[in-house]
Amino acid sequence: VTCDLLSFEAKGFAANHSLCAAHCLAIGRRGGSCERGVCICRR
């Protein structure tokens, strides 16, 4: 959801990746990133 919700990039900074990482941290994971529009959390 977070990857498609705010998928924009400004000066090389992708806000959707930050939101995905924050989502993953909130559920107890070690961060994450977007891959093909899907938020993938690290284990």
From Swiss-Prot:
Q: Which PANTHER family match?
A: DEFENSIN (PTHR13645:SF0)
Task: Tell me a GO cellular component.
Answer: extracellular space
Keyword Transmembrane among UniProt keywords: no
Instruction: Name the protein family.
Output: Belongs to the invertebrate defensin family. Type 1 subfamily.
User: Per UniProt, which keywords does this protein have?
Assistant: Antibiotic, Antimicrobial, Defensin, Disulfide bond, Immunity, Innate immunity, Secreted
Annotated signal sequence is none
**What is the role of the protein in this entry?**
Antibacterial peptide. Affects Gram-negative bacteria including methicillin-resistant Staphylococcus aureus.
Where do the TM regions start and end?
Answer: none
Q: What is its main location?
A: secreted
Name of the featured protein: Defensin
> What's one Pfam family the UniProt record gives for this protein?
Defensin_2
Q: Which InterPro entries does this UniProt record tie to the protein?
A: Defensin_insect, Defensin_invertebrate/fungal, Scorpion_toxin-like, Scorpion_toxin-like_sf
Which Gene3D superfamilies has this protein been placed in?
Knottin, scorpion toxin-like
Origin organism is Trypoxylus dichotomus
* Reported induction: By bacterial infection.
Show the disulfide pairing: 3-34, 20-39, 24-41
